[in-house]
Every structure is written in structure tokens, then in C-alpha cells.
Amino acid sequence: MYPLRSKVTTVGRQASGARALWRATGSKESDFGKPIVAIANSFTQFVPGHVHLKNVGDIVADAVREAGGVPKEFNTIAVDDGIAMGHSGMLYSLPSREIISDSIEYMVNAHTADALVCISNCDKITPGMLNAALRLNIPTIFVSGGPMEAGKAVVVDGVAHAPTDLITAITASASDAVSDEGLTRVEESACPTCGSCSGMFTANSMNCLTEALGLALPGNGTTLATHSARRDLFEQAGRTIVDLCRRYYGEEDDAVLPRSIATKEAFSNAMALDMAMGGSTNTILHTLAAAQEGEVDFTLEDINEISYRVPCLSKVAPNGTYHIEDVHRAGGIPAILGELRRAGHLNLKVHTALYDNAEEWLDDWDIRGGKATEAALELFHAAPGGVRTTEPFSQSNRWDELDTDAANGCIHDAERAFSSDGGLVVLRGNLAPNGAIVKAAGVEEELWTFTGPARVVESQEEAVSIILKKEVQPGDVIVIRYEGPAGGPGMQEMLHPTSFLKGSGLGKACALITDGRFSGGTSGLSIGHISPEAAHGGLIGLVENGDPITINIRERQLTLDVDEEVLERRRATEEQREKPWTPKERNRPVTKALRAYANMATSADRGAVRVVDGYVN
């Protein structure tokens, strides 16, 4: 039997002071000696994906208590990337991932909690909590707030928008063809309920990947925030974490620990899922970071190999017209994993927090496999309510029938894949010797090869300005540099430039490349994560207006077509500047908090994690 971590604060004479304080929080004599379960909630009124989580911690806590544990809840910060988008607020988004990880480590270790329930949902919160779970390596279960319902169809200025979402609204705002009145109609329809934004954007992608890793319950990635079935997941999470405590502390079963579950094979499966569902490019950034926290040897090269062999089986917004509620109706994450299993693209030598082996897990939950349980069939019938609300669990609508059409439905089988390659592709070349990422699932195939002159800017704001001023020409390659993890700092998302390009009618006529990153809502020929970034001496820092740039997704190449001698002269000139490898003209205040992140941040090929040197243990 392993001793409870919390024993140091609950047992013996020396723990008397700590016990006195525990009693002041509501703990009783009978609680001492039971596992203390930390519930990391992320409720905030700033974020629709988290606005409904205020009382959810109580649901989990009640289940923990009934199962024999002692629940103690605390909160993390949560940044809404959509509200922070397009202005200096976006500088704080990616660094907030590290703050979330650190804050959970601080709370759990300072109070010697025995286990952890992560109530996450949106863009940086799930990755931040995942990093913390792998860092702490105590029994952990994830349960997210759930996705938002898709917006209702609207007809604006004679053009149908069906169904709507956040990206519909942002794109419409840049279109001269949409009136102010029409824009308001789109805006009012786009985000109708609480929950993470309704497409296969970063938040939903990461919640789906956490399910595939085995650290979340089946259905976690796709069950709507508004549906009563989501409440069942929270209750089950509370019961499950106490059982994991029993197995680990009582039976010395190390298999239930996060690092035993999230192995290299599990990371490979999660990334295979990502390729199959065309997830956000941010998932690569966060997966690389999580692997490092868990000391798993999983790199960009592994992701590149998976991308070559795993087909794209689904095109969900922004890559198509389906939304997460449609993925759920088609069987959710187990259905996609089931298709990969049948095609031989899944490693079955893994287990989950609930199941000892992958075969049993997928047999029970893959509705297309022929062995699914009644619980699985019931769960995936959960449908949207179609009513504007910020209340969770507020409806119990059901689909009349499930979508099991592997040829024309939301999830295809491997024989009828959208493409033989994965939805995310790693590019290399002299512009990105350490890699760059493109969401191939969101790029029209006629744009997979593209050559054009560079139009260089040194901030997202400048990019937005030249697009809205119509200074960008068809065929241009917009280069946004010094927006990487260190150069930004904070590696801003470029959703506004890509959305405004689309809204201006240039979405299929231009390319955009950056050492920054993109929102999960981005589609089109948008290449991010260029490594090394400009601030670290990357070649993107030497590009000049008019330089020809060639993109070849099929050949996985990103090339600056300029003679090496010319580039060496430019590099020598850059090195002689008073402040080399910094923007020449950019007025951007950088706070102490952001400087701290910038001084430790690695480039995107390493997950933009911090490297802390100089500490001697």
C-alpha cells in the first residue's frame, strides 16, 4: 500500500496545526485518512466555454464525497482567445498555459493533494491542465465543460450562412457585401449557448485529444455543454477519481497514473486522431509540450510520420459545414478511433483511466464496431436544444437516428477518406529547417502548390492594416514575423488576418506564413509555427518584399527562393544592427510578465515550452 500524499497534513501529532486548518475548511474527523481530491475548476464569466462551470465543481465534489474521497476545489485563470484576438490581449494567451500549469502544481503540491480532477474546456486551459497532470503524475481525470451548440442558419443580404459560428461572424465583418444590419444578425446567431466554440477549433480539438490519450471519459470531447448527458460525465468523473485513488494507493497499481496512460503509443494515437479529424494546428504545439512534461520521447518527426500514413476522415468547421454536435451524432471520438483501428492505424497497446486495454474500450464505445454498449448508443443520441442559454444540462433532446454513413456522413472510413494524408502537415525547407505547420484539411487542393512574392510585415496589426486597406494583391505571400513565442512575445494567433483575407475575397488567392500561430478557426493557405522563429535568428527574419516564396504541401516544402550568397549578406547586416533579430519598427509595450515568458520560451517545434537554466538541485 502506498501512503497517501496528504498523510503529512492529516495524520500524527505534527499535523495538528494543518488538521486545525482543514477543520476550518469544513473537514471532519472522519475525513482524515481519506484521499484528498483537488478539483481544479476554471470557471470565469469572461469565457462562454467556462461561464457555466460555477456550480459544476459541486457536482464533482458531491460524487467524490459519496465515493469516499475528500474534495477540495480551487480555480485557475482562463483566457478567451476569441475576445483576446486581434489586439494586445492575444500576447497573453499562450503564456497563460504555463501560468495554469504552474498554479495547479503550486496548489496540489502545497496542500499535498492525493489526486486531481481537471475541469477544463477552452484553448489554453486544457493544455495547461494536461501539462500539470503529467508533471505531477498523481491519479487524474479530465472532464471538460463541453462544446457549444452551432448557431442557427441565417440569410444575410441574400446570402445563406448555415450553420453559423464564431468564424462566420469574424469573416462577415471584413466583407463589404455584408451590411451592418446583416452583420448583427450573423453575430447574434453565431454563439448561441455556453460551451467551447462549436467547430473543430483548438478547444474542442484538445478535449478530443485528451479523450484519445485515455485521460478523459468517453464522450468528453463531443457531448454538448447544454445536454443533461454532460452532467452524467461530471458525476462519473467524481466516482472515477476515487476509484483511481483506491487502485493506486490501496493496490499500488501504477498503471492508473497519467504517465502510465499517456505513453508514446497513446500520444501517437492522439495525433492519429488529430490527423483524421483535421484538428487545430495548435494541437501540435500543445502535444509537444505535454510530451515534454511527461518525459515522453515524442517529437515533430513522430508527428510528421503519422501525417504521412493517417488519412483525413472528417472535415468539420472551419474545414467543412459539420460541427462538433455532428461528430457526436456520428459516434464521437471512439467512432473515429474505431475507423483508424479497422484501417490498422491505431496502436492497441494502450490503456485508459477506465479500461485496462484499448480493445475493450473501443468495443464498448465505437457505435460502428457492432459491439457498442447501450450506454454508448444512448450517449451519442444526445442532440442540441436549439435554445439560446448559458445554463448547462438544460435540455435532453435526442437525435432520431445516429449518423453511421461512412461514405457521405460526418465521419468517413479509410477507404473513402477525404485525403490519404493527415489533416495536418509538417513542412520543411530553408524557411523552416526545424518545421512549420499547415492545416492541409483546410486548404483547397489547387492551392497545395503556390509561388508568390513576399509581402513582409512585422506584426499582426500591420497585417490586418494592409489587408483592410486593400494593399495586398492576389498571388502575394504575406509574411508575418517576430510573432513567435519569444519575438511576440507570446506567439499570437493570426485569426483576424486570415479571416479578413477570406472576407476580402482573397482567401483562395493569397498565402500567409508566420512564426506565430493560427486559431483553430483558421482555414486557407496559412502556414504557422515557422521554426526557428525570427527572434531566434530564423531565415524568416531575412525575407524582403518581393522575394519569391514557394509552398508545396504535397512535397512538404517551404522555400525562400533567394541565393544563399544574398542571404548571407543580409544575415551579416542583421547581426550588425544595434538590436539584431528584433522588429525594425514596432511600437509594442511588453510587460514584465511577458518578458519573463519571452526570456525562457523555445520555438514552436519544441512546443513553445519554457527552458529554465541555471538551477542547481
From Swiss-Prot:
Residues at which Mg(2+) binds: D81, D123, K124, E493
Record carries keyword Transferase: no
Enzyme class, first EC level, given as a word: lyase
Database matches in InterPro entries: Dihydro-acid_dehy_C (IPR042096), DihydroxyA_deHydtase (IPR004404), DiOHA_6PGluconate_deHydtase_CS (IPR020558), ILV_EDD_C (IPR056740), ILV_EDD_N (IPR000581), IlvD/EDD_N (IPR037237)
One Pfam family from the record: ILVD_EDD_N
Catalyses which reaction(s): (2R)-2,3-dihydroxy-3-methylbutanoate = 3-methyl-2-oxobutanoate + H2O; (2R,3R)-2,3-dihydroxy-3-methylpentanoate = (S)-3-methyl-2-oxopentanoate + H2O
Domain of life: Bacteria
UniProt-listed GO biological process terms: isoleucine biosynthetic process; L-valine biosynthetic process
N6-carboxylysine sites (modified residues): K124
Names of the cofactor(s): [2Fe-2S] cluster; Mg(2+)
Assembly: Homodimer.
Family in the record: Belongs to the IlvD/Edd family.
Protein name: Dihydroxy-acid dehydratase
